[in-house]
Curated annotation (Swiss-Prot):
Gene3D superfamilies: Aconitase, domain 3. Catalyzes the isomerization between 2-isopropylmalate and 3-isopropylmalate, via the formation of 2-isopropylmaleate. Keywords: 4Fe-4S, Amino-acid biosynthesis, Branched-chain amino acid biosynthesis, Iron, Iron-sulfur, Leucine biosynthesis, Lyase, Metal-binding. The lineage of its organism: Bacteria, Bacillati, Actinomycetota, Actinomycetes, Frankiales. Binds 1 [4Fe-4S] cluster per subunit. It comes from the Bacteria. Its EC number is 4.2.1.33. It comes from Parafrankia sp. (strain EAN1pec). The gene is leuC. GO terms for molecular function: 3-isopropylmalate dehydratase activity; 4 iron, 4 sulfur cluster binding; metal ion binding. PROSITE patterns: ACONITASE_1 (PS00450), ACONITASE_2 (PS01244). The keyword tRNA-binding does not apply. This is 3-isopropylmalate dehydratase large subunit.
Length: 465
Protein backbone atom coordinates (compact mmCIF):
# COMPACT_ATOMS: atom_id res chain seq x y z
CA UNK A 1 0.00 0.00 0.00
CA UNK A 2 1.23 3.47 -0.85
CA UNK A 3 2.45 5.98 1.71
CA UNK A 4 1.98 9.70 2.12
CA UNK A 5 4.89 12.13 2.28
CA UNK A 6 4.53 12.39 6.05
CA UNK A 7 4.51 8.62 6.46
CA UNK A 8 7.67 8.24 4.37
CA UNK A 9 9.62 10.77 6.43
CA UNK A 10 8.28 9.37 9.70
CA UNK A 11 9.16 5.77 8.82
CA UNK A 12 12.69 6.76 7.79
CA UNK A 13 13.35 8.17 11.27
CA UNK A 14 11.92 5.49 13.58
CA UNK A 15 14.81 4.05 15.61
CA UNK A 16 12.63 2.06 18.01
CA UNK A 17 9.08 0.79 17.72
CA UNK A 18 7.21 -1.25 20.34
CA UNK A 19 3.55 -2.20 20.73
CA UNK A 20 1.62 0.24 22.88
CA UNK A 21 4.45 2.76 23.01
CA UNK A 22 5.22 5.92 21.03
CA UNK A 23 7.72 5.56 18.21
CA UNK A 24 11.20 6.84 19.00
CA UNK A 25 12.21 9.26 16.24
CA UNK A 26 15.71 10.40 15.34
CA UNK A 27 15.91 14.19 15.02
CA UNK A 28 18.03 15.64 12.20
CA UNK A 29 17.99 19.30 13.25
CA UNK A 30 17.25 20.93 16.60
CA UNK A 31 16.68 24.69 16.60
CA UNK A 32 16.93 26.58 19.89
CA UNK A 33 16.09 30.09 21.13
CA UNK A 34 16.25 31.94 24.43
CA UNK A 35 12.72 31.42 25.76
CA UNK A 36 12.15 27.65 25.89
CA UNK A 37 15.73 26.45 26.39
CA UNK A 38 17.07 27.72 29.77
CA UNK A 39 15.40 25.03 31.90
CA UNK A 40 16.40 22.32 29.42
CA UNK A 41 20.08 23.26 29.52
CA UNK A 42 19.98 23.57 33.30
CA UNK A 43 18.54 20.07 33.59
CA UNK A 44 21.44 18.75 31.51
CA UNK A 45 23.88 20.61 33.71
CA UNK A 46 22.39 19.17 36.91
CA UNK A 47 22.45 15.65 35.47
CA UNK A 48 25.98 16.01 34.17
CA UNK A 49 24.91 15.24 30.61
CA UNK A 50 26.40 16.76 27.44
CA UNK A 51 24.46 17.80 24.35
CA UNK A 52 24.39 14.62 22.28
CA UNK A 53 24.80 16.26 18.86
CA UNK A 54 25.86 19.91 19.12
CA UNK A 55 26.60 19.75 15.39
CA UNK A 56 22.87 19.19 14.76
CA UNK A 57 21.83 21.97 17.15
CA UNK A 58 21.60 25.67 16.27
CA UNK A 59 20.62 28.57 18.51
CA UNK A 60 19.64 32.14 17.75
CA UNK A 61 18.36 35.09 19.75
CA UNK A 62 14.99 36.23 18.46
CA UNK A 63 11.95 36.39 20.77
CA UNK A 64 13.15 38.88 23.38
CA UNK A 65 15.63 40.99 21.44
CA UNK A 66 14.91 44.67 20.76
CA UNK A 67 14.75 45.80 17.15
CA UNK A 68 16.20 49.25 17.89
CA UNK A 69 19.28 50.27 19.89
CA UNK A 70 20.62 46.74 19.47
CA UNK A 71 24.14 47.73 20.54
CA UNK A 72 22.87 48.69 24.01
CA UNK A 73 22.16 46.24 26.85
CA UNK A 74 18.64 44.77 26.81
CA UNK A 75 16.56 46.93 29.16
CA UNK A 76 13.98 44.40 30.36
CA UNK A 77 15.58 42.28 33.11
CA UNK A 78 13.71 39.06 32.25
CA UNK A 79 14.53 39.32 28.56
CA UNK A 80 18.14 40.17 29.35
CA UNK A 81 18.43 37.18 31.70
CA UNK A 82 17.06 34.77 29.09
CA UNK A 83 19.42 36.03 26.39
CA UNK A 84 22.41 35.91 28.72
CA UNK A 85 21.45 32.38 29.80
CA UNK A 86 21.34 31.25 26.17
CA UNK A 87 24.80 32.69 25.53
CA UNK A 88 26.25 30.93 28.58
CA UNK A 89 24.50 27.65 27.80
CA UNK A 90 25.67 27.61 24.19
CA UNK A 91 29.23 28.37 25.28
CA UNK A 92 29.16 25.68 27.98
CA UNK A 93 27.66 22.98 25.77
CA UNK A 94 29.36 23.79 22.48
CA UNK A 95 26.22 24.82 20.59
CA UNK A 96 26.53 27.25 17.68
CA UNK A 97 24.78 30.54 18.47
CA UNK A 98 23.85 33.58 16.39
CA UNK A 99 23.67 36.45 18.92
CA UNK A 100 22.21 39.90 18.38
CA UNK A 101 23.92 41.81 15.56
CA UNK A 102 25.55 38.68 14.13
CA UNK A 103 25.18 38.70 10.32
CA UNK A 104 23.27 35.39 10.54
CA UNK A 105 21.07 36.29 13.55
CA UNK A 106 17.34 36.38 13.12
CA UNK A 107 14.10 34.56 13.77
CA UNK A 108 14.87 30.88 14.10
CA UNK A 109 12.42 29.85 11.36
CA UNK A 110 13.91 32.36 8.93
CA UNK A 111 17.54 31.55 9.72
CA UNK A 112 17.30 27.77 9.22
CA UNK A 113 15.99 27.87 5.65
CA UNK A 114 18.17 30.76 4.48
CA UNK A 115 21.29 28.86 5.58
CA UNK A 116 20.21 25.70 3.76
CA UNK A 117 19.85 23.79 7.03
CA UNK A 118 16.20 22.87 6.41
CA UNK A 119 16.11 20.13 3.79
CA UNK A 120 13.59 17.65 2.36
CA UNK A 121 13.09 14.45 4.31
CA UNK A 122 14.45 15.81 7.58
CA UNK A 123 12.94 15.74 11.04
CA UNK A 124 13.23 19.21 12.59
CA UNK A 125 12.13 20.33 16.05
CA UNK A 126 12.24 23.53 18.07
CA UNK A 127 10.68 24.74 21.28
CA UNK A 128 8.39 26.96 19.26
CA UNK A 129 4.90 26.47 17.81
CA UNK A 130 5.79 27.63 14.32
CA UNK A 131 8.46 25.04 13.62
CA UNK A 132 6.03 23.71 11.01
CA UNK A 133 7.47 26.45 8.75
CA UNK A 134 10.23 24.05 7.68
CA UNK A 135 7.65 21.60 6.36
CA UNK A 136 7.63 23.73 3.21
CA UNK A 137 10.75 21.78 2.21
CA UNK A 138 9.15 18.38 2.66
CA UNK A 139 10.56 18.06 6.17
CA UNK A 140 8.59 16.77 9.14
CA UNK A 141 8.92 19.76 11.45
CA UNK A 142 7.02 20.46 14.65
CA UNK A 143 7.18 22.38 17.90
CA UNK A 144 8.07 20.79 21.22
CA UNK A 145 7.91 21.72 24.91
CA UNK A 146 10.81 22.47 27.23
CA UNK A 147 11.02 18.94 28.66
CA UNK A 148 11.18 17.62 25.09
CA UNK A 149 13.89 20.17 24.28
CA UNK A 150 15.92 18.59 27.09
CA UNK A 151 15.24 15.09 25.71
CA UNK A 152 16.45 16.03 22.24
CA UNK A 153 19.51 17.84 23.57
CA UNK A 154 20.43 14.76 25.61
CA UNK A 155 19.59 11.97 23.12
CA UNK A 156 18.92 13.46 19.65
CA UNK A 157 15.70 11.43 19.72
CA UNK A 158 12.09 12.07 20.67
CA UNK A 159 9.22 9.68 21.52
CA UNK A 160 6.16 10.56 19.43
CA UNK A 161 2.85 8.92 18.58
CA UNK A 162 2.20 8.57 14.87
CA UNK A 163 -0.12 11.35 13.67
CA UNK A 164 -3.00 11.08 11.24
CA UNK A 165 -2.65 12.57 7.77
CA UNK A 166 -4.74 15.22 6.04
CA UNK A 167 -4.58 16.51 2.48
CA UNK A 168 -5.53 20.12 1.75
CA UNK A 169 -5.72 20.47 -2.02
CA UNK A 170 -6.02 23.98 -3.45
CA UNK A 171 -7.21 23.51 -7.02
CA UNK A 172 -6.55 26.00 -9.80
CA UNK A 173 -4.43 29.13 -9.75
CA UNK A 174 -4.68 31.96 -7.26
CA UNK A 175 -6.03 35.24 -8.67
CA UNK A 176 -3.70 38.20 -9.05
CA UNK A 177 -3.22 39.94 -5.72
CA UNK A 178 -3.96 36.83 -3.65
CA UNK A 179 -0.99 35.62 -1.63
CA UNK A 180 0.12 32.63 0.41
CA UNK A 181 -1.07 34.43 3.55
CA UNK A 182 -4.55 34.81 2.10
CA UNK A 183 -4.53 31.14 1.14
CA UNK A 184 -3.65 29.86 4.61
CA UNK A 185 -6.10 32.23 6.33
CA UNK A 186 -8.80 30.87 4.01
CA UNK A 187 -7.81 27.30 4.89
CA UNK A 188 -7.98 27.97 8.63
CA UNK A 189 -11.30 29.79 8.27
CA UNK A 190 -12.61 26.73 6.42
CA UNK A 191 -11.46 23.94 8.76
CA UNK A 192 -11.29 25.90 12.02
CA UNK A 193 -8.57 26.25 14.64
CA UNK A 194 -9.15 22.65 15.74
CA UNK A 195 -9.73 21.13 12.32
CA UNK A 196 -6.17 19.90 12.01
CA UNK A 197 -5.80 18.52 15.54
CA UNK A 198 -3.89 15.25 15.50
CA UNK A 199 -2.97 15.57 11.82
CA UNK A 200 0.01 16.35 9.68
CA UNK A 201 -1.39 18.43 6.82
CA UNK A 202 0.03 18.03 3.33
CA UNK A 203 -0.73 21.02 1.10
CA UNK A 204 -1.21 20.06 -2.53
CA UNK A 205 -2.67 21.30 -5.78
CA UNK A 206 -1.87 23.75 -8.55
CA UNK A 207 -2.11 26.84 -6.33
CA UNK A 208 0.36 25.41 -3.82
CA UNK A 209 2.79 24.33 -6.55
CA UNK A 210 2.66 27.86 -7.93
CA UNK A 211 3.93 29.38 -4.68
CA UNK A 212 7.54 30.39 -4.17
CA UNK A 213 9.47 28.68 -1.36
CA UNK A 214 8.89 31.71 0.83
CA UNK A 215 5.17 31.54 0.12
CA UNK A 216 5.18 27.85 0.97
CA UNK A 217 6.88 28.66 4.26
CA UNK A 218 4.08 31.11 5.06
CA UNK A 219 1.49 28.39 4.47
CA UNK A 220 3.24 25.71 6.51
CA UNK A 221 4.08 28.22 9.25
CA UNK A 222 0.41 28.66 10.16
CA UNK A 223 -0.51 24.97 10.16
CA UNK A 224 -0.43 25.05 13.96
CA UNK A 225 -3.15 27.73 13.87
CA UNK A 226 -5.45 25.05 12.45
CA UNK A 227 -4.43 22.79 15.32
CA UNK A 228 -2.19 20.60 13.14
CA UNK A 229 0.93 18.86 14.40
CA UNK A 230 2.79 19.90 11.27
CA UNK A 231 2.34 21.06 7.69
CA UNK A 232 4.25 19.75 4.68
CA UNK A 233 4.66 20.36 0.95
CA UNK A 234 6.39 17.78 -1.24
CA UNK A 235 9.73 18.99 -2.64
CA UNK A 236 10.00 19.85 -6.33
CA UNK A 237 12.16 21.92 -8.67
CA UNK A 238 11.19 25.09 -6.79
CA UNK A 239 12.57 23.52 -3.61
CA UNK A 240 15.79 22.36 -5.23
CA UNK A 241 16.51 25.73 -6.84
CA UNK A 242 15.96 27.50 -3.52
CA UNK A 243 18.43 25.21 -1.75
CA UNK A 244 21.06 25.09 -4.49
CA UNK A 245 24.22 26.93 -3.41
CA UNK A 246 23.10 27.77 0.12
CA UNK A 247 25.84 27.57 2.78
CA UNK A 248 24.83 24.23 4.32
CA UNK A 249 23.29 22.58 1.26
CA UNK A 250 25.06 19.57 -0.28
CA UNK A 251 27.44 20.17 -3.19
CA UNK A 252 28.83 18.20 -6.12
CA UNK A 253 28.04 14.49 -6.10
CA UNK A 254 26.39 14.84 -2.68
CA UNK A 255 23.95 17.35 -4.19
CA UNK A 256 23.07 14.99 -7.03
CA UNK A 257 22.51 12.13 -4.60
CA UNK A 258 20.41 14.33 -2.32
CA UNK A 259 18.16 15.51 -5.15
CA UNK A 260 17.72 11.94 -6.35
CA UNK A 261 16.47 10.98 -2.89
CA UNK A 262 14.39 14.13 -2.47
CA UNK A 263 12.50 13.30 -5.66
CA UNK A 264 11.17 10.15 -3.95
CA UNK A 265 9.52 12.25 -1.24
CA UNK A 266 6.11 12.50 -2.83
CA UNK A 267 2.87 10.90 -1.73
CA UNK A 268 2.33 7.67 -3.65
CA UNK A 269 -0.62 7.62 -6.08
CA UNK A 270 -2.30 4.79 -4.15
CA UNK A 271 -1.75 6.33 -0.71
CA UNK A 272 -4.78 7.33 1.33
CA UNK A 273 -5.20 10.23 3.72
CA UNK A 274 -7.27 10.07 6.89
CA UNK A 275 -9.04 13.25 5.84
CA UNK A 276 -9.13 15.42 2.72
CA UNK A 277 -10.17 19.03 2.11
CA UNK A 278 -10.50 20.66 -1.31
CA UNK A 279 -10.43 24.44 -1.80
CA UNK A 280 -11.08 26.36 -5.00
CA UNK A 281 -8.07 28.61 -5.57
CA UNK A 282 -9.57 30.99 -8.17
CA UNK A 283 -12.38 31.91 -5.76
CA UNK A 284 -10.01 33.24 -3.08
CA UNK A 285 -9.40 36.93 -2.40
CA UNK A 286 -7.41 38.95 0.16
CA UNK A 287 -8.31 37.77 3.67
CA UNK A 288 -8.25 39.41 7.10
CA UNK A 289 -9.06 38.20 10.59
CA UNK A 290 -11.86 39.98 12.43
CA UNK A 291 -11.82 38.04 15.72
CA UNK A 292 -9.46 36.67 18.33
CA UNK A 293 -8.23 33.49 16.68
CA UNK A 294 -6.87 32.90 13.16
CA UNK A 295 -9.96 30.91 12.16
CA UNK A 296 -12.12 34.00 12.62
CA UNK A 297 -11.20 35.34 9.21
CA UNK A 298 -13.06 36.42 6.09
CA UNK A 299 -12.49 38.11 2.73
CA UNK A 300 -11.55 41.75 3.23
CA UNK A 301 -14.46 42.65 0.96
CA UNK A 302 -16.99 41.24 3.45
CA UNK A 303 -18.61 42.78 6.55
CA UNK A 304 -17.99 42.02 10.20
CA UNK A 305 -20.10 38.90 10.86
CA UNK A 306 -23.33 38.92 12.85
CA UNK A 307 -23.35 36.49 15.80
CA UNK A 308 -27.06 35.91 15.17
CA UNK A 309 -26.14 34.12 11.93
CA UNK A 310 -24.48 31.30 13.91
CA UNK A 311 -26.94 28.54 14.80
CA UNK A 312 -24.61 26.80 17.24
CA UNK A 313 -24.80 28.51 20.67
CA UNK A 314 -21.12 27.88 21.41
CA UNK A 315 -20.02 29.37 18.09
CA UNK A 316 -22.38 32.31 18.56
CA UNK A 317 -20.99 32.99 22.02
CA UNK A 318 -17.43 32.80 20.71
CA UNK A 319 -18.20 35.37 18.02
CA UNK A 320 -19.92 37.66 20.51
CA UNK A 321 -16.91 37.56 22.84
CA UNK A 322 -14.49 38.15 19.98
CA UNK A 323 -16.39 41.15 18.65
CA UNK A 324 -16.67 42.63 22.13
CA UNK A 325 -12.91 42.38 22.62
CA UNK A 326 -12.18 43.68 19.12
CA UNK A 327 -14.74 46.48 19.56
CA UNK A 328 -16.38 45.73 16.22
CA UNK A 329 -20.01 46.20 15.21
CA UNK A 330 -21.68 43.45 13.14
CA UNK A 331 -22.32 44.50 9.56
CA UNK A 332 -19.50 47.05 9.45
CA UNK A 333 -17.49 46.65 6.23
CA UNK A 334 -14.09 45.27 7.19
CA UNK A 335 -12.58 47.80 4.80
CA UNK A 336 -13.93 50.58 7.06
CA UNK A 337 -12.03 49.36 10.13
CA UNK A 338 -9.32 51.88 11.07
CA UNK A 339 -6.02 50.83 12.63
CA UNK A 340 -3.39 52.58 14.73
CA UNK A 341 -0.37 50.42 13.89
CA UNK A 342 0.87 48.31 10.99
CA UNK A 343 3.44 45.57 11.60
CA UNK A 344 5.28 43.93 8.70
CA UNK A 345 7.53 41.09 9.81
CA UNK A 346 7.57 37.80 11.82
CA UNK A 347 8.48 34.21 10.92
CA UNK A 348 5.30 34.17 8.82
CA UNK A 349 6.02 37.18 6.63
CA UNK A 350 9.44 38.65 7.39
CA UNK A 351 11.36 37.29 4.38
CA UNK A 352 12.73 39.23 1.43
CA UNK A 353 9.76 38.49 -0.86
CA UNK A 354 7.39 39.77 1.83
CA UNK A 355 9.35 43.00 2.13
CA UNK A 356 9.39 43.38 -1.64
CA UNK A 357 5.60 42.96 -1.74
CA UNK A 358 5.16 45.63 0.90
CA UNK A 359 7.65 47.99 -0.75
CA UNK A 360 5.91 47.62 -4.12
CA UNK A 361 2.73 48.97 -2.53
CA UNK A 362 4.41 51.75 -0.52
CA UNK A 363 6.74 52.99 -3.26
CA UNK A 364 5.81 56.60 -4.06
CA UNK A 365 3.11 56.67 -1.37
CA UNK A 366 2.92 58.00 2.19
CA UNK A 367 1.87 56.41 5.45
CA UNK A 368 -1.41 57.86 6.74
CA UNK A 369 -1.11 60.67 9.29
CA UNK A 370 -0.68 59.48 12.85
CA UNK A 371 -0.14 55.84 11.91
CA UNK A 372 2.77 53.85 13.33
CA UNK A 373 4.33 51.43 10.82
CA UNK A 374 7.04 48.97 11.85
CA UNK A 375 8.93 47.02 9.18
CA UNK A 376 11.08 44.33 10.80
CA UNK A 377 13.15 41.94 8.66
CA UNK A 378 13.13 38.32 9.75
CA UNK A 379 16.91 38.09 9.87
CA UNK A 380 20.02 40.21 9.55
CA UNK A 381 20.66 38.56 6.19
CA UNK A 382 17.20 39.62 5.00
CA UNK A 383 17.91 43.12 6.33
CA UNK A 384 21.17 43.30 4.38
CA UNK A 385 19.51 42.03 1.20
CA UNK A 386 16.64 44.50 1.53
CA UNK A 387 19.06 47.38 2.06
CA UNK A 388 21.13 46.30 -0.94
CA UNK A 389 17.94 46.54 -3.01
CA UNK A 390 17.03 49.93 -1.53
CA UNK A 391 13.85 48.67 0.12
CA UNK A 392 14.75 50.37 3.39
CA UNK A 393 14.78 53.69 1.54
CA UNK A 394 11.31 52.98 0.16
CA UNK A 395 9.97 52.29 3.65
CA UNK A 396 11.64 55.32 5.21
CA UNK A 397 10.50 57.62 2.39
CA UNK A 398 6.93 56.46 2.96
CA UNK A 399 7.18 57.21 6.68
CA UNK A 400 7.65 53.67 8.01
CA UNK A 401 10.10 52.69 10.73
CA UNK A 402 12.83 50.34 9.44
CA UNK A 403 14.07 48.06 12.23
CA UNK A 404 16.66 45.39 13.00
CA UNK A 405 15.88 41.64 12.97
CA UNK A 406 13.76 39.86 15.57
CA UNK A 407 10.32 38.53 16.41
CA UNK A 408 9.26 42.08 17.29
CA UNK A 409 5.53 42.79 17.49
CA UNK A 410 4.46 39.24 16.72
CA UNK A 411 4.31 38.73 20.49
CA UNK A 412 4.48 40.96 23.54
CA UNK A 413 7.86 39.70 24.80
CA UNK A 414 10.02 42.63 23.67
CA UNK A 415 9.70 46.42 23.47
CA UNK A 416 7.58 46.34 20.27
CA UNK A 417 4.03 46.11 21.61
CA UNK A 418 0.57 47.58 21.21
CA UNK A 419 -0.85 49.80 23.90
CA UNK A 420 -4.25 48.89 25.43
CA UNK A 421 -7.02 49.58 22.93
CA UNK A 422 -4.67 49.98 19.98
CA UNK A 423 -5.56 48.14 16.79
CA UNK A 424 -3.03 46.68 14.36
CA UNK A 425 -2.88 45.21 10.89
CA UNK A 426 -0.19 42.58 11.33
CA UNK A 427 1.55 40.10 9.05
CA UNK A 428 2.19 37.79 12.01
CA UNK A 429 0.40 34.51 12.80
CA UNK A 430 -1.70 34.97 15.94
CA UNK A 431 -4.44 37.42 16.87
CA UNK A 432 -5.19 36.14 20.36
CA UNK A 433 -6.31 38.56 23.06
CA UNK A 434 -3.26 40.45 24.27
CA UNK A 435 -0.89 38.68 21.89
CA UNK A 436 0.75 41.93 20.78
CA UNK A 437 0.39 43.59 24.16
CA UNK A 438 -2.30 43.76 26.88
CA UNK A 439 -5.55 45.06 25.42
CA UNK A 440 -4.15 45.16 21.88
CA UNK A 441 -6.41 44.22 18.96
CA UNK A 442 -4.83 42.36 16.05
CA UNK A 443 -5.99 41.83 12.46
CA UNK A 444 -3.87 39.30 10.55
CA UNK A 445 -3.16 40.25 6.93
CA UNK A 446 -0.66 39.72 4.11
CA UNK A 447 2.30 42.09 3.61
CA UNK A 448 0.59 43.67 0.60
CA UNK A 449 -2.62 44.33 2.55
CA UNK A 450 -0.58 45.62 5.48
CA UNK A 451 1.21 48.10 3.22
CA UNK A 452 -2.04 49.26 1.61
CA UNK A 453 -3.55 49.65 5.07
CA UNK A 454 -0.58 51.80 6.06
CA UNK A 455 -1.45 54.20 3.23
CA UNK A 456 -5.16 54.57 4.02
CA UNK A 457 -5.19 54.00 7.77
CA UNK A 458 -7.91 51.35 7.42
CA UNK A 459 -7.95 47.73 6.30
CA UNK A 460 -7.35 47.95 2.56
CA UNK A 461 -6.53 45.65 -0.33
CA UNK A 462 -3.84 46.98 -2.70
CA UNK A 463 -6.29 46.81 -5.60
CA UNK A 464 -8.43 49.42 -3.82
CA UNK A 465 -5.71 52.07 -3.59
Amino acid sequence: MGRTLAEKVWDAHVVRRADGEPDLLYIDLHLVHEVTSPQAFEALRLAGRPVRRPDLTLATEDHNVPTTDTLLPIADPVSRAQVEALRKNCADFGVRLFPMNDPDQGIVHVVGPQLGLSEPGMTIVCGDSHTSTHGAFGALAFGIGTSQVEHVLATQTLPQRRPKTMAVTVQGELPAGVTAKDLILAVIARIGTGGGAGYVIEYRGEAVRGLSMEGRMTVCNMSIEAGARAGMIAPDETTFEYLRGRPNAPTGADWDAAVEYWRTLATDPDATFDHEVVIDGPSLSPYVTWGTNPGQAAPLSSPVPDPAAYADPAARGSVERALAYMDLVPGTPLSDVAVDTVFIGSCTNGRISDLRDAADVLRGRQVADGLRVLVVPGSMAVKAEAEAEGLDEVFRAAGADWRSAGCSMCLGMNPDTLRPGERSASTSNRNFEGRQGPGGRTHLVSPAVAAATAVTGRLTAPADL
